[in-house]
Structures are given as C-alpha cells and as structure tokens.
UniProtKB/Swiss-Prot annotation:
Residues 511-547 are cytoplasmic. This is Intercellular adhesion molecule 3. Residues 30-485 are extracellular. The keyword Signal applies. It comes from Homo sapiens. Belongs to the immunoglobulin superfamily. ICAM family.
Length: 547
C-alpha cells in the first residue's frame, strides 16, 4: 500500500539531493526506459493530477514515485504503477524509478501550475484632478503565476494606457496620465492577463473594480461680486456673484453671506459661467460696516470675492400737525423729526442739530387752507449724503365768501340774449351758492348759460351758505328791452305791403278783362280806335287827359 508523504517533511533541497543520488552512472547504460505520463503537464493551482509510470523491463521490481506533493498509489502491476497527486499548489518535478536487472531506471516530468491573481486593485484616484496636470494610475497585483505569462494592463474606458509584465510579488504597475476635460467622469481600471495559450489553455483575464475620475478647471481670478454700497435696515437688495471659465460649473458650490448671515442663493450655470443670485435683507442688529462675501468652491479649491457694505437706519422724516384740520384764527404747530444723525429742514428752516426736530407755528387763515409743509432729511453714510422728503397738508375751516371780483354786482344785459352769471363762492366746507330775486322765489342759475328776458330784470340776493355761516351779495340785473316804435313801424310796413299787393292784383285783373272785349274797325278812319265794351262806359268815366 502506497504511503502519503507530506511535502512539509521533505524540504525542497532534500528532494533535489535524492534525485541526484538516484541518477547513478548505471543509468546511462540502461537498456530499458521508464516512462512518466503525462509529460510536463499544466494545471491550475490546487488541482489533482493522475500520473502513470511504466517500463518494458521484463524483470522490473516495484516502481516508486518520488515527489514533494501529496501522492497516493492508485493501482500497480507488472512494469507499471499509477499515482494520484492532489492539491498541487506550485511548480514541481516528479521522478519515477525502478530496478531492472539490478540497475535503476528513472523517468521524470515537470508539473507547471498556473494561478490567477488573488487581488487586482487600482489604487484610489484623487477626489478632484486639475485639468492639465499629471496624475498617476497605480495597480497592485497579488499572486498569480507563472509570472512570465502574467501581464498588467491599465485602462481608461476600454482604451489601453499601459501594458507591463508583472514581475515582483506583489507586483505594482504605474502609469502617468495628463488630465483633460474629457477625463471627467471617465472610469479607470486595471486588468491582468494570464496567457496560457501556448500550453493550450487560453487567456485568463481578471479586472479590478473601476474608479471614476473627476477633473476640474478653476480660474485664478476671483468672482465678480455686484452688491450695494449701502443697505437700509429692513430693506432688501439683490446680490449677484459671477465666475467665468469654470468646469464643470454644475458641480461648483457657492456661498453668499452678509456678514455672518448666510444668503439663500439661486445658482445658474451656462456653459463655463456660473451665476449666483440672492437677496440681502439687513437686520437692525447689523447696522454699521459689514461685508458681502461670495465663495465659489470646486475640486477642493476656493475663489473668494468681498465687497464692503454699510447697513444704516434712516427713520423719517415724519411731519406732524398739531391740528390737521384747524379753525380759522387758531394756532397750529408744525413739527418734523427723523432718526439719530439725521438733519431735518422744515420749510427751509433747519433744525438746531442732527437728530433734533424742527418746528414752526402759525395762526391759521383762509389762505393757509390746503397749504403744504415740506420737510427734507439728510443722512451722511460713509461719505455719501442720502436725502428724503416728506410733506403734510393743512386744512383750515372758514366761513363762506363770494369773490366780488368774479361776481359783478351790476349787470346790463339785453332782452332775449344768452348769458352766464359768473359768481363763485369759497369756504371750507365748500358752500352752496344760490341767487334769488327779491320779492319772489325766482332763482337764476349760477355758472350755467341761460336765456335772458325782461322778466329777469331786478335785484337778486346771491347767498353762499355752509355749516360755518352765510354770506350774501346783492346783484342787480338791468335788462334792456327793444325800441318802443318798433312794433308800429313793423305793422305799418306790413299794411303798406298788403295794400300794394291788393292794388297790383286789381290792376292785373282789369287789364285781363280789357284784352278779352269786342272791337269794331271803322273804314273811314286811318287809325283804329279801340272802344271797350266793359261796363266802364256805362259808368260815364272819361279818359284822363294831360293838361
């Protein structure tokens, strides 16, 4: 029965010595051969191998197999023996021997073991790589044999960047790559190729997990920051921050702040340009000198811009009246005030000092009704003067009045003509104006055209009335009638025209009758007298004669 000989009991040097001792000079004169099959086999690490040793020597003794590997005699017979080698983990040489006619015959075979790498790993890439700068790809390979057939390939996508043999254990292969924009988001990996095709086994490939590279471009120039120089408390103003030449702009981070107050920015990018917009609102506790800050961060690098800003408080001006609606003759006080450090001027009269109010007093009169009082305020902020204005209007209550200049007291108009009674009343509250004829309730319209006749002749009481009292003005209307002989003359003319018309009509009728009568011609006469047969002959009228 075959015995299992652990390889740990026989160091490699001892087995080499044993093989050398077995190769005695008598071997060269041997007439018979000892065959070992298979010859020079190749198998994967950890596999098993069936080995057959045979000889044609007719008087051979027991065949032995010498190896550092675990072995087991499977079967044997005259001139042959079969062994099973298990857990073959490394390259080895096996030796079969037998005694034939007192001489030792040997045969050998070399076992080649191939092993895929246990670890193929691409070293981590930089979190961000500047475009235009070199970076190193580093691949580490542990185990794998035979090394003469093992190659390490560095890849970008499927593009080969470097191909090198794996030499050391562990093997480390590197390649230098110039970063470009096209490399942003590209996967890099490491691949090992164990080429066992010459042994008829094929090409064994093992690939590492890919690592993604992020490249960036960040210009050295700071962002352009557009912000106000001054900002009033409780007011808002837009702030813009722009940076050009940024890649990839979509992955940049923007920080906008007013002092220690972070602003809610809206970030937009177009190509390689990034723009952040926010609204800055000043608080009361921020009054004074502050800074607007814009930070753009990409690839672990930062570009920053700062602008000075002054937060100020500008209260007023506030204009007050002691009586917004005053009675005529009363005293009214007008005052104007504003915040600290503000200089106010009321109707051209400045206050004593900044922060102090300005005042004036007046006795309210009719002319003050509707009067406006103006107050201007000036505040100096960081060398600049800011101005604001405010006003207030005074209302004065006074009794009704009629303007004599626009309401003539004596009017001369002609009968049957159109005229307008131009009278105007004033007062606060605005009065009602009516013009009534004395002795009657007849009212004439005021400010409206009307047809004048002789009945409007007389004296009128024009009265303006309101809750403040009444005011009356006497207006006399003198209506001139037409000439007194006009009617008789007109009647006479009509009668004359009538008589003339009748006479002409009678003459026309008489002449027509004469033309229609009978006439007799007298022969003895050399002329033809015409004798009318009309009844006029019977009346004895004689023809007129010229004297």
């Amino acid at each position: 029965m075959a015995t299992m000989v652990p390889s740990v009991l026989w160091p490699r040097a001892c087995w080499t010595l044993l093989v050398c001792c077995l190769l005695t000079p008598g071997v060269q004169g041997q007439e018979f051969l000892l065959r070992v099959e298979p010859q020079n086999p190749v198998l994967s690490a950890g596999g098993s191998l069936f080995v057959n040793c045979s000889t044609d020597c007719p008087s051979s003794e027991k065949i032995a197999l010498e190896t550092s590997l675990s072995k087991e005699l499977v079967a044997s017979g005259m001139g042959w023996a079969a062994f099973n080698l298990s857990n073959v983990t490394g390259n080895s040489r096996i030796l079969c021997s037998v005694y034939c006619n007192g001489s030792q015959i040997t045969g050998s075979s070399n076992i080649t073991v191939y092993r895929l790498p246990e670890r193929v790993e691409l070293a981590p890439l930089p979190p961000w790589q500047p475009v235009g700068q070199n970076f190193t790809l580093r691949c580490q390979v542990e185990d794998g044999s035979p090394r003469t057939s093992l190659t390490v390939v560095l890849l970008r996508w499927e593009e080969e960047l470097s191909r090198q043999p794996a030499v050391e254990e562990p093997a480390e292969v590197t390649a230098t790559v110039l970063a470009s924009r096209d490399d942003h988001g590209a996967p890099f990996s490491c691949r090992t190729e164990l080429d066992m095709q010459p042994q008829g086994l094929g090409l064994f490939v093992n690939t590492s997990a890919p690592r993604q590279l992020r490249t960036f471009v960040l210009p050295v120039t700071p962002p352009r920051l557009v912000a106000p120089r001054f900002l009033e408390v409780e007011t808002s103003w837009p702030v813009d921050c722009t940076l050009d030449g940024l890649f990839p702009a979509s992955e940049a981070q923007v920080y906008l702040a007013l002092g220690d107050q972070m602003l809610n920015a809206t970030v937009m990018n177009h190509g390689d340009t990034l723009t952040a917009t926010a609204t800055a609102t000043a608080r009361a506790d921020q009054e004074g000198a502050r800074e607007i800050v814009c930070n753009v961060t990409l690839g672990g690098e930062r570009r920053e811009a700062r602008e000075n800003l002054t937060v100020f408080s500008f209260l007023g001006p506030i204009v007050n009246l002691s009586e917004p609606t005053a009675h005529e003759g009363s005293t009214v006080t007008v005052s104007c005030m504003a915040g600290a450090r503000v200089q106010v001027t009321l109707d051209g009269v400045p206050a004593a000092a900044p922060g102090q109010p300005a005042q004036l007093q007046l006795n309210a009169t009719e002319s003050d009704d509707g009067r406006s009082f103006f107050c201007s305020a000036t505040l100096e902020v960081d060398g600049e003067f800011l101005h604001r204005n405010s006003s207030v209007q005074l209302r004065v209550l006074y009794g009704p009045k009629i303007d004599r200049a626009t309401c003539p007291q004596h009017l001369k108009w002609k009968d049957k003509t159109r005229h307008v009674l131009q009278c105007q009343a004033r007062g606060n509250p605005y009065p009602e104006l009516r013009c009534l004829k004395e002795g009657s309730s007849r009212e004439v319209p005021v400010g409206i055209p009307f047809f004048v006749n002789v009945t409007h002749n007389g004296t009128y009481q024009c009265q303006a009335s309101s809750s403040r009292g009444k005011y009356t003005l006497v207006v006399v209307m003198d209506i001139e009638a037409g000439s007194s002989h006009f009617v008789p003359v007109f009647v006479a003319v009509l009668l004359t025209l009538g008589v003339v018309t009748i006479v002409l009509a009678l003459m026309y009728v008489f002449r027509e009758h004469q033309r229609s009568g009978s006439y007799h011609v007298r022969e003895e006469s050399t002329y033809l007298p015409l004798t009318s047969m009309q009844p006029t002959e019977a009346m004895g009228e004689e023809p007129s004669r010229a004297e």
